[in-house]
From Swiss-Prot:
PPIases accelerate the folding of proteins. It catalyzes the cis-trans isomerization of proline imidic peptide bonds in oligopeptides. It catalyses: [protein]-peptidylproline (omega=180) = [protein]-peptidylproline (omega=0). This is Peptidyl-prolyl cis-trans isomerase-like 4. SMART domains: RRM. The gene is cyp6.
Length: 461
């Protein structure tokens, strides 16, 4: 008992395990017989794991009901999902195992409710699916198709970007009798409007294989340019991806190193008013890099200068003139520098002319103020006019002490003239202290000698 699935990627032959899962095999065979699976999309593709199909419209469509069993089609919505028992001996241990997608039955935990959706494994030993899906068949032919499905480009929900669909189903052998009311269609039906609404890139759509090499190269360059522009926008080099270079700016190269901004502006000013003209120079040395940017007020003047000045001899050098879009990186850096210079000339802060930086953030003013710092002395300073003795000590602390001692205020000098240079301490001076200590010891010594004589006199008595 086998079924042939004709898909958009090739044919797949499935052998049905009728003895182990008779009810699931009957459901699958009869759905194939009524052409229920025609135009069903592949979805839930998980690389090296599995893919799912069997919903004729697809789970992304609001018109989808998730599929139906053959008995639901014949008897009504009450039989849309039928309970099936899990075959105990069958496991998802081989690539190409086919099983019915199922959910647990609310009435019996040993049963699973299935409709029309089925799963095909893309890897070996997928025990995660054991006990969750009802196995009913094995793929015996078409493993190359399984590999193509495994390598397909998919979105974040697992649906292939280019549709993979079941085109036809062919029953090779059917051992089951048809249920009452089943009528086999004479030919494969056309896709419904709901099915056609789910098409992304049709499985038979040509993606440019008939284009010539030149057209393919042009298309590739356009895509690469858009990708690069988007990258520059993300990193902040461009304000937006579709930005266009200015059309009133000329790029002039092959200049003589001695050519100055004023010379170039004078030569090009005969074509119209020039807003800015700058020879680009090395930031470190200031030497000319031998190219410049000239910004005209009008695009017409810029175009006229472009046609007239190409190959003109300036300072013994034949210059090359082009529009700035041919060297967009150089033009961008020059434009940023020009905007900064203009902003500095206009004044203001943050693009608003009325704003002004706080004083602590004005680097130039701070530097100017620090350069004008000076020592300030009191006009009534009565420092000693006598020459200071030269100190033979090299200690900076001693010099600082002498400076502090010599630089007395007038108030302190008047105090010293009134009371003298006497110390504020109540203790006697050092030399007086030594004399007092010596007299004290002498008195004790005399008193001791006197006491000893008295003691000897008592002994004699």
């Amino acid at each position: 008992m086998s079924v042939l699935l004709e898909t958009s990627l090739g044919d797949i032959v499935i052998d049905l395990l009728v003895d182990e899962s008779p009810k699931a095999c009957e459901n699958f065979l009869k759905l194939c017989k009524v052409k229920y699976y025609n135009f069903s999309p592949f979805y839930s593709v998980q690389k090296n794991f599995s893919f799912q199909t069997g919903d004729p419209i697809g789970p992304d469509s609001p018109d989808s009901n998730g599929g139906s069993s053959i008995w639901g089609l014949l008897e009504g919505p009450s039989k849309q999902a039928v309970p099936l028992a899990l075959p105990p001996k069958l496991k998802h241990d081989e690539k190409g195992t086919v099983s019915m997608a199922a959910v647990p039955s609310p009435h019996d935990p040993d049963l699973r409710l299935v409709t029309s959706q089925f799963i095909v494994t893309l890897g070996d030993n997928l025990d995660y699916l054991d006990g969750k899906a009802v196995i009913f068949g094995k793929v015996v032919e078409g493993f190359d198709v399984l590999e193509k499905v495994n390598e397909a480009f998919i979105d974040d929900r697992g649906r292939p970007l280019k549709d993979i669909r079941i085109r036809h189903t062919v029953i090779l052998d059917d051992p089951f009798d048809d249920p009452p009311g089943l009528v086999e269609p004479p030919e494969s039906p056309l896709p419904t409007k709901a099915q056609l609404a789910t098409v992304r890139i049709a499985d038979d759509e040509d993606l440019g294989d008939d284009m010539d090499e030149a057209s393919m190269e042009k298309l590739r360059r356009e895509r690469e340019a858009r990708a690069q522009a988007l990258t520059l926008e993300m990193v902040g080099d461009l304000p937006f991806a579709e930005v266009k270079p200015p059309e009133n700016v000329l790029f002039v190269c092959k200049l003589n190193p001695v050519t100055q901004d004023e010379d170039l502006e004078l030569i090009f000013s005969r074509f119209g008013k020039i807003l800015s003209c700058e020879v680009i120079r090395d930031k470190r040395t200031g030497d000319s890099l031998q190219y410049a940017f000239i910004e005209f007020e009008s695009q017409k003047d810029c175009e006229q200068a472009y046609f007239k000045m190409q190959g003109v001899l300036i300072d013994d050098h034949r210059i090359h003139v082009d529009f700035s879009q041919s060297v967009s990186k150089l033009s961008e850096s020059w434009r940023d520098a020009t905007v900064k210079k203009r902003s500095a000339q206009r004044g203001g802060f943050g693009g608003v002319a009325g704003l002004e930086k706080k004083r602590q953030y004005r680097a130039s003013e701070n530097a100017r103020e620090r350069a004008n710092y000076n020592m300030v002395f009191d006009k009534n300073d009565n420092r000693r006019s006598a020459p200071r003795e030269r100190s033979y000590s090299r200690s900076p602390q001693r010099n600082n002490y002498r400076d502090r001692r010599d630089s007395r205020s007038p108030r302190r000098d008047s105090y010293r003239s009134r009371y003298g240079d006497r110390s504020n301490s109540r203790s006697p001076p050092l030399r007086d202290r030594d004399r007092i200590r010596t007299d004290y010891y002498d008195n004790d010594r005399r008193r001791g000698y006197r006491d000893d004589d008295r003691y000897r006199d008592r002994r004699r008595r």
